[in-house]
Design a protein with these regions (language model features):
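Sec-dependent N-terminal signal peptides
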Residues: 4-16
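N-terminal amphipathic/hydrophobic interface segments
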Residues: 18-175
Length: 175
């Protein structure tokens, strides 16, 4: 019985340490807040995730216990498919592999679609980018698509939406 307990204990310990090594964080200034048990990163913050996504910002707070990083100011995410996300407030959960923005967000997809919205989520496990807020998408030809919510399938480069959809083409026609 003791050997089973120790095996489970050491297995859990090894798995916990392995998951912490999948996140790379660097910045010019690093400090610790012992009261809140977080690490604070300032000036040229760079985070690389296990999925090889890169997150750059001016400021980040990392709570290792929760696996949560909060970002502020000049955030730029480049995912492994070369989609780019810009925002001023966001957080990344290293456990669930979900990146969420708070407030206005701009996305440039790898196929040159520009997306303006807010409160956008990048789910690395499901390989989707989505929002339940009003979103405006502009394609390479200048056509404008307004949606109440959307889902972008990263692997297939496909947009999906249910509900209100308005399309204005580059000639001024709309539907």
């Amino acid at each position: 019985m003791k050997s089973n307990f120790f095996f489970i204990f050491f297995s859990t310990l090894l798995l916990t340490n392995a998951s912490a090594e999948n996140l790379f964080i660097q910045s010019k200034n690093i400090s610790l807040d012992k009261n809140r048990e977080i690490s604070i990163f300032e000036n040229e913050v760079l985070v690389r995730t296990e999925e090889n996504n890169e997150i750059i910002s001016d400021y980040a707070e990392y709570d290792k216990k929760k696996g949560l990083i909060k970002f502020k100011d000049n955030i730029l995410v480049t995912d492994n498919k070369k989609n780019k996300i810009e925002a001023d407030f966001a957080e990344y959960n290293d456990i669930t592999k979900i990146f969420k923005t708070n407030g206005p967000t701009k996305i440039l997809t790898n196929e040159n679609y520009t997306i303006f919205g807010e409160d956008i989520t990048l789910n690395n496990k499901l390989k989707i980018i989505n929002s339940n807020k009003k979103t405006v998408i502009t394609d390479q030809d200048g056509n404008i698509i307004t949606l109440n919510k959307f889902e972008y399938l990263i692997e297939e480069n496909i947009f999906k939406s249910i509900g209100f959809i308005e399309i204005k083409d580059n000639q001024g026609n709309s539907t």
